[in-house]
Amino acid sequence: MKRVIIIYIVFCSLPSFAQIDQMSRFEIEQKGSDHSWTIINMKENGVALVRDKNKFLNSDKIFEIRTLDTALVESGYTEVTVPSRVHLIGYEYTDEYLYVLLRSGENEVAHVLLLEYNLANREVEQFDIKHDFNLRLTHFTVLDRHAILAGYVAREPAVLIYDIPNSVLKVVPGFFTSDTELLDLRINENGTFNTLVTNRSTRQSKTLVLRTFDAAGTQLMEDEIPIDQNKTILSGLTSSLVREEMLIAGTYTIGNNKAAAGFFSVLADPFKEQPIHYYDFAQLGHFLDYMSVKRAEKIKNTSQRFREKSKDPEFKTNVSNVRLEEKTAGFFLLAEAYSTITASNTGPYPYGAYGPYYSPFGGMYGYSPYSSRFYNSPYSFYNQATRSDFSMLSTSVLAFSPDGKLDWDHSLKADDERKPALEQVADFWCDKNKIVIATKSESDLIVQVRFKNNEVLGDTVQILKNKPTDLVRDETDGEGGVRHWYGDKFYVWGYQTVKDPELRFEDRTRSVFYLIKVDAY
């Protein structure tokens, strides 16, 4: 197979506005029949690229795994054969191993195939994980060579742990409860993991239940947090004990409404009751910035009048929580607002608000450098009546102080292009004084910086090309994006058709997958 790999390195500085340095570009030929790449963030260890090669060996098909270092130089390449009917649904990364999760069929299955790729010797082992019931998988991660699978059996949450070295599967007790929803599964810095569950029953007091387990599934801690009876928790994320405190943050609504009314936050403490802090959207400084000034002011004024009368404001919208970042200065929640565009008579999306392979980190169920993240509610699954497209409205970052209370926020208006699946459109990094949000629009990279004193810097640049004389003939819609990598670094990816006018006519045009390292501050 002919492969074209090009590395282009350039150092530049834009002295005005936000600073954007596009440091290097990786390219590889992308033919029309090729599958898209799944990008796995390995932080300071680089990135991994995984895809179905669309080639077969006997009755099996071939997956390829390509690793790049932080300079985007290829550091390893491996091919592995798997059963022909499986497809990639998730991934995870640890310091020593890369994990790829595959399955055959759709939705609820009784077994999955796990690939364990050794980053040192580039060898791959396969593990067939079977259980006696169909599990609709919503979360996947790995802790100390224990694969943690979570989801729903019928409408009841379930958590399974597969001991990889011993090939033993265990069902974690304490779940399989009706009228409950699994909101989060998160690995902690101290070698434990959290689950976050909320009950949906109107016949009992509503609660958030946080549990912490060791890698083998032994419960170490439980914290039950009461929820205001007129409110419903829609989504929630837990921090991962980078700090001593653990924050739970997400969205809530009033009653049984499906759209969010605002954000909530609470510090977990199993030894004393901690109040949940609720913030309607109009209380945030910049959440409504995607609207016209007139409309935003009207919502803020109306919401203020409701609060003065001890009533809940009426404004609601759809919000997807993406990740919860921990810093010395506190906690930072990335969330994105969106609207739904309903199309009748087309049948339901089987996974409700998200497509069946959606992850806020672009890789189905599973890994981000911060946590596993794939939210999938059985309530939207069973109640979704029509098919919906999505229009992203804005990306917001909320900064919480160490005591768990909202401190300040930043937002960036999103492209309102209609999409068939809900996808993360931007990412961020931060320190105690500023929040940097980056996003991609076709062949442009957009960066906006907000300082805590409310000063704003921003800039838009064309995405780095292999050669200054190259002409981008086409940028594939719906493919590509921006993700935070490590430190103040992002990576940007996409698919382009590029013309090089300096080459012979028959060699001028190439179709490529590209990956760019960006320093934005």
Regions found by a protein language model. Give the residues of each.
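Short glycine/acidic-enriched loop and turn motifs that connect beta-strands
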Residues: 54-58, 105-109, 154-157, 200-204, ...
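Beta-propeller blade signature
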Residues: 62-70, 112-121, 161-165, 206-219, ...
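Repeated scaffold domains used in trafficking and secretory/extracellular systems
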Residues: 31-40, 82-93, 129-142, 177-188, ...
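Loop/turn-rich, solvent-exposed surfaces of beta-rich toroidal or solenoidal domains
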Residues: 320-340, 346, 374-399, 419-458, ...
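Bacterial Sec-dependent N-terminal signal peptides
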Residues: 1-24
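Post-signal peptide N-terminal segment of secreted/secretory-pathway proteins
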Residues: 39-153
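A short beta-strand motif characteristic of beta-propeller blades
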Residues: 22-30, 74-80, 123-129, 168-175, ...
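Conserved blade-ending motifs and adjacent loop-strand segments that build the rim/top face
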Residues: 223-235, 275-318, 408-426, 455-487
